[in-house]
């Protein structure tokens, strides 16, 4: 007996670019698991990369690591933030007045206090997802506690929008950071101004070229360099404050309020530059899973915040004493003899800041792949002992190309600042919206408390975002364009994969029917172990049906394996896989991975031996299906989105590579699917 075959086209056994789909909606899987548990036929095992969400101690080593990775972006903002703000109220004929400079210094300080200290360090960092932070973790928390499918979709869209803006930020950060650092050449050697752009491009090319080596070894030096950087910031700030000690009065919010009231619309424009002082605040939350709350909080409160405040106030004091210092107040705080060493230190600091954004993009992209929002791509591990240290070649060179184009197009850090703020404030808004849901539904805050606390921050974030919307014609369109394009790509991929899964469900044979007919089958059984990968554990994989059609045989031992992507950072320890016996020598295996984990299917399956289910990695053969997608007569996707989806599908990495299956153990069949 051979079960009926669905329509197909172009059967082949090769290594195509994309393999079996991995489900994103786990409803069917969970139902299968719970049913199996109730029948007493399941076993749960470990097997895979495990992690821990427990709080980490805030020792000196942890604090150094935090300074080297987390605070690079926000720590290099003094290079350009205050200069950009004061430039708005200054002109060659009418330099900024002391009260205006004090007002902007006060606005900068209170932006650091409200957005970074209170919103992120005190509040948002409480909302961890099994120890992990970041907007993806926050989105997963919000979706988990929401019963309405409509709101789940809405919160997913908010999370994806914030994520896409982060990608835009990751392109702009290396460009503006490196540019602002090398612009110091013009201060110490004015005749060398013509080499600023070429030098910035050389630094950027070098930065992205060494990504393939990983940050394991050089990362150990990041912490001490940033300790030196923040110490120098504080020392320079104190030096500047002695020029005009009254600048410390700007710690009072009355100066900020006075500036807003007296300047009206101009103060609204200035807020678009003030927000540059808090770029990188999202990194505190995103890196919480790597370092824990305590080291990040202590480093901010006792070292980073004081250093930044002193430097901003020192620059402001210098500008009050010498309005002509507006050309570059940061470097003009530095004694002439130390400007070249400071240029070198600033370049190192900006490279570290850029490195943090690039590494964060790699990690975020991996999470999105696991959640099904992006196609699989080649992921390289740069450190055999550190699972989190990864390199994505395709993403790396997309970021590099974008950063180089921005340097050539904008040419100065002050011009590029217009493109920077809107990505940062957009991410702030998305995080605030998701936090409202999490603090109300997860932490059980009263509705009134949530409305007052996060309503206030939503208003603050909205004001900053609106101020940056004014910059759209001057460069603010860049991160918006990147965000819109990224959102279209992610939603198109998600939609396309769901259409494929629905079509496979409609065309496939139920697993129960296959098992019921198997005892009466005359199909020849051959020695060996066959692993059939399937996105849906309730249906017979197309790869098995094609194997029956072409080879007329079944193996003695069969495993139907489904890889389930969880909406949590890691699978629970001891709950990596669930095994259910369907028939003699036929088992269903569901292997689960969180969005922070890298799948390793052969490693997980080796653990089956402990439960009496024989698995020999040398003898196992893996059978997968490759979808040959075409447009149906009644298409469910617009033509332009279909083109995008097919392009992504053609360039996606294979299942073999993504699940780390040995290529020489794989047999793959092509299946034609119309959507």
From Swiss-Prot:
Record membrane topology: Multi-pass membrane protein
UniProt keyword list: Cell inner membrane, Cell membrane, Ion transport, Membrane, Potassium, Potassium transport, Symport, Transmembrane, Transmembrane helix, Transport
Compositional bias segments (type: Basic and acidic residues): 1-12
A GO cellular component annotation in the UniProt record: plasma membrane
InterPro entries: K+_transporter (IPR003855), K_trans_C (IPR053952), K_trans_N (IPR053951), Kup (IPR023051)
Signal peptide location: none
Region (Disordered): 1-25
Species whose genome carries this gene: Gluconobacter oxydans (strain 621H)
Protein name per its UniProtKB record: Probable potassium transport system protein Kup
Keyword Ion transport (UniProt): yes
Keyword Magnesium recorded: no
Family to which the UniProt record says this protein belongs: Belongs to the HAK/KUP transporter (TC 2.A.72) family.
